[in-house]
């Protein structure tokens, strides 16, 4: 049994005088049930154990409810159903929580839903990919899964235990064990936040990436072409946004704020472009830490990105 969602988080303004089209997220959201029609499903991963292990600033375990509150009062422009499937809560046993989340993702995908994960530290990424891989392996012997990560960090660290700094190395190892290609594209890499050893590791693994300074509004055509080339090489897409890819002024509520970062307008545009490819199967938003946020700026950014993925 999975815990029921806390529907009390879905509260906000009601514009009844404006008619039926004056809808907001909190009015449209429904608790998930196994007989629900295929639609978008929000699934939280309330964890910052990976952040703690990675020597970061804790608080991301409070991200999922903060993100729901930020979503609740947004105008709803969709027609399809949307459901809240609650949170997988991680304590000290991160690995068990990742397994639980992966199985939940696989089950939801098997029922035809598109899952949007709400983090939580970026340790959500390994759990998300594992769930997608589990689902696709039931139908394809050699699925070509692309991983699109908007992030200031490669997250390819070597460590004795899983953390928020290791998920894509773990995914690479999972792909190697399954004899699958490791197709990883990272947009927004900070040269000063990744050691030479991590750049070497990325090169060995064939990671495609663009630096934060290359992802500029005035250089959008190059970024689009880079993304399109990656999307053409895969059949299925897992998209993850680590909020520290954004400038600290836009997203202060993360463990490791970016001095440079990539503007929200660029990130949102490329997220929408990836979604429009028709290959998106699973997405998540990671590293929202409301304890470090200022005036809910980061939560609002995260909510807008979730809306971009859903509507």
Curated annotation (Swiss-Prot):
One of its GO terms (molecular function) is agmatinase activity. Pathway: Amino-acid degradation; L-histidine degradation into L-glutamate; L-glutamate from N-formimidoyl-L-glutamate (hydrolase route): step 1/1. InterPro entries: HutG, Ureohydrolase, Ureohydrolase_dom_sf. Signal peptide: none annotated. Mn(2+) 1 binds at residues 122, 151, 155, 242. It catalyses: N-formimidoyl-L-glutamate + H2O = formamide + L-glutamate. The keyword Manganese applies. Its EC number is 3.5.3.8. It comes from the Bacteria. Keywords: Histidine metabolism, Hydrolase, Manganese, Metal-binding. Coiled coil: none annotated. Mn(2+) 2 binds at residues 151, 153, 242, 244. Binds 2 manganese ions per subunit. Disulfide bonds: none annotated. GO terms for biological process: L-histidine catabolic process to glutamate and formamide; L-histidine catabolic process to glutamate and formate; putrescine biosynthetic process from arginine, via agmatine. Its cofactor is Mn(2+). Belongs to the arginase family. PANTHER family: ARGINASE/AGMATINASE (PTHR11358), FORMIMIDOYLGLUTAMASE (PTHR11358:SF35). Catalyzes the conversion of N-formimidoyl-L-glutamate to L-glutamate and formamide. This is Formimidoylglutamase.
């Amino acid at each position: 049994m999975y815990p029921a969602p806390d529907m009390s988080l879905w509260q906000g303004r009601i514009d009844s005088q404006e008619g039926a089209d004056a809808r907001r997220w909190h009015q449209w959201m429904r608790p998930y049930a196994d007989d629900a029609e295929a639609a978008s499903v929000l699934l939280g991963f309330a964890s910052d154990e990976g952040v703690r292990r990675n020597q970061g600033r804790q608080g991301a375990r409070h991200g999922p409810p903060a993100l729901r509150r930020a979503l609740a009062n947004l105008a709803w422009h969709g027609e399809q159903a949307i459901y809240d499937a609650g949170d997988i809560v991680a304590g000290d046993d991160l690995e068990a929580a990742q397994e639980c989340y992966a199985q939940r993702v696989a089950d939801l995908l098997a029922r035809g839903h598109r899952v949007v994960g709400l983090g939580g530290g970026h340790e959500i990424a390994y759990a998300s990919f594992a769930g997608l891989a589990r689902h696709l392996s039931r139908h394809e012997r050699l699925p070509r899964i692309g991983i699109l990560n908007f992030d200031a960090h490669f997250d390819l660290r070597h460590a004795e235990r899983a953390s928020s700094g290791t998920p894509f190395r773990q995914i690479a190892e999972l792909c190697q064990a399954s004899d699958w290609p490791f197709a990883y594209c990272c947009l927004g890499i900070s040269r000063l936040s990744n050691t030479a050893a991590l750049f070497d590791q990325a090169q060995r693994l064939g990671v495609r990436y663009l630096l934060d300074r290359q992802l500029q509004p005035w250089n959008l055509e190059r970024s689009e072409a880079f993304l399109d080339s990656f999307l053409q090489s895969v059949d299925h897409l897992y998209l993850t946004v680590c909020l520290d890819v954004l400038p600290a002024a836009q997203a202060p509520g993360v463990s490791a704020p970016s001095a440079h970062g990539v503007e929200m307008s660029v990130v949102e545009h490329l997220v929408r472009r990836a979604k429009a490819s028709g290959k998106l199967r699973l997405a998540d938003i990671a590293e929202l830490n409301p304890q470090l946020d200022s005036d809910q700026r980061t939560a609002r950014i995260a909510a807008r990105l979730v809306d971009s993925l859903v509507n």
